[in-house]
Amino acid sequence: MRVDVVSIFPEYFAPLDLSLIGRARASGTLQLAVHDLRTWTHDVHRTVDDTPYGGGPGMVMRPEPWGEALEALAPPGGNPPRLLVPTPAGAPFTQALAHELAAEPHLLFACGRYEGIDQRVLEHAASRMPVTEVSLGDYVLFGGEVAVLVILEAVTRLLPGVLGNVGSLDDESHAHGLLEAPMYTKPAVWRGQEVPTVLRSGDHGKIARWRRDEALARTVARRPDMIAALPPECLDPRDRAALERAGFPDPPEGVAK
């Protein structure tokens, strides 16, 4: 996968040389380049922002450097990348979107600052490449750099060969619309607290059922919206019983009791 990131703070992305992302870069699985937006400015002050039309606080990122940057990194006539723009006004970033992005051959990230990027940049870009405005959540950051770090980590770990054990992707939180069950390791007893007996039983069927029930209960307690969004056909009668024990008020309809 090729990834280009444009920012006025390219140093922000130094952590992408570390850990599994660093290995993915070293192996060529992830071809990542970070670019300084000010490269595409032409005045002595390397200006990238100006006051907003209509008044109001803050500054807005000017369209000229962004237009040149996008044309340089995604030349007209070539295979267009998918442009990702982190913004509080974007659609929520989800694990499903991470999987979608992991299937793209080329991603281009535009890191906004101040009050954001002049809207004309995104409208013009949309005429020649897919544009996705994305938000990490209902809060505001100083800029898009932190969001890009999060999105890149979520996407890179889904690329083939990045994780040593691909089975790790199957049972983690959000993989099947649920939060992951609690996890334990050695020792069996720590400060008087024991690992649940079923996990030490060696009975794989019972262990799988316990983890499923715990995942359902944890999701009910912390993210009932995820339970409400589950397709009825993905729940069997034992799942429904677990939801009732967990106190979910209205399990999804359509599953035989």
UniProtKB/Swiss-Prot annotation:
* GO biological processes: tRNA N1-guanine methylation
Listed A to Z, the keywords are: Cytoplasm, Methyltransferase, S-adenosyl-L-methionine, Transferase, tRNA processing
Q: Name the positions where S-adenosyl-L-methionine binds.
A: G112, L136, G137, D138, Y139, V140, L141
One family from Pfam that matches here is: tRNA_m1G_MT
Record's InterPro entries? Answer: Alpha/beta_knot_MTases (IPR029028), tRNA_m1G_MeTrfase_C_sf (IPR023148), tRNA_m1G_MeTrfase_TrmD (IPR002649), tRNA_m1G_MTases_N (IPR029026), tRNA_MeTrfase_TRMD/TRM10 (IPR016009)
Q: Which HAMAP family does the record cross-reference, listed alphabetically?
A: TrmD
Subunit notes for this chain? Homodimer.
Role noted for this protein: Specifically methylates guanosine-37 in various tRNAs.
Cross-referenced NCBIfam families = PRK00026.1, trmD
Q: What is this protein called?
A: tRNA (guanine-N(1)-)-methyltransferase
Species name for this entry? Salinispora tropica (strain ATCC BAA-916 / DSM 44818 / JCM 13857 / NBRC 105044 / CNB-440)
